[in-house]
């Protein structure tokens, strides 16, 4: 802001000149006092300059609707939507999300700095306020086969970008606990730059929470219970309640919220597919859930706006008051969170559930390196997935938990044969993680229980966080065909049965993002999910999203990597038997 702009706003606030926009006949939510205000809202240069009686060059009649602050998603990986930031904005703005804090560590794990630069450039071509946290753990663990490695020196220049708020979720807790040199430098660089540091404390003890707070880690979005939430609040953290496409923790954590500690809680989605964003929305859905669960509506809206702004130092976001950006929602039904109009900095960007602005997507095209990310040394065949076993020893199996990121380690008797073959009656399927960044010919094999497929295979290049190819299936031929299909289409999601493609969703940008519109991707995903019934899937959870987290070796208990089974609690690889 320059001097001229400030003078212009002061003149409008002092009523020496008309405001650019005045909103009349609205019921304004005061998230500070938790009460309603019945006054005009005066806006100049996209900023609220007054509440009271004002004249404006343009008048908007709210017609008695409630006006609330724009929602803030406190932690989201935009890449998990499978669309670019420009298309992501079109999906969430109609639901009232006006600000997001994003961690581009998905694309950074594939393409490093080029991936971050692409996301930053895309963000500049949308009215959605997109703030960035720099990926702290690329790869998530030192033994991972990611497409890039980001050291402290690689991240430091990005702190000069105005959109960057700090260091993203620190998930390599071993490096923090052991004060590993480069991790300490990352933490220091963020602190010296006056930035925030996000946490990732999945399943960690209170001793480790102490260590994280000592490292200036401010928040955690991996909380799954009231007890975990209170442990973090006691140690000065903010707690994000998460509701994504797989991890659905809001209702389990909500009982921890009370009138005394509510300002330390806010909402996030973390990972949410575009079909879910379009159908139910983002933070608006969590506000609705919280109200339905009995939370005071004023508190629910505060958790959806002000609290995240305070956590991240966004001092012009999260409330309707002079000096704040005019990020406003017109709401016709408070409890159902029915958003009829969304404004960002005084501009109407969505109305009647649709985005109403023009973007400039063509000026933010991806670098060619992002379009060539699936690099297998050669096409795979069924022999590449053979899995010898000892029939006298039990097999270590990954047991999935529907709609959760955590898994369990179970043991089952080995079959008499000397080689493992999937057993659909026992729901024991084969899982494979195939390195796809450098053509290393490295494949980890294991057994997984809980998908319930009766035939065929599925595979995807979305495989947190290193995003190698991950596949699960009932036979080696279809697993090989699924992996090869992903190389053919440049990454994405696919279903194979009897060697034939049932449906695929291409994601050519880093194997993570589509170059199509949100609506087009949504339609393709609907077709994909419809086809799952042809391989025996009976529903209840999203198998692709569940599969995509089975290679993340920082969330308990047991995961798969390109080098085999990994026990998260002992933080070491274990054998199949």
UniProtKB/Swiss-Prot annotation:
The keyword Cell cycle belongs to this UniProt entry's keyword annotation: no
Keywords, sorted A to Z: Hydrolase, Manganese
Any GO BP: adenine catabolic process
SUPFAM superfamilies according to UniProt: Composite domain of metallo-dependent hydrolases, Metallo-dependent hydrolases
Family: Belongs to the metallo-dependent hydrolases superfamily. Adenine deaminase family.
Stored HAMAP family: Adenine_deamin (MF_01518)
Name assigned to this protein: Adenine deaminase
Protein species of origin: Bacillus subtilis (strain 168)
Upper taxonomic lineage: Bacteria, Bacillati, Bacillota, Bacilli, Bacillales
Record gene name: adeC
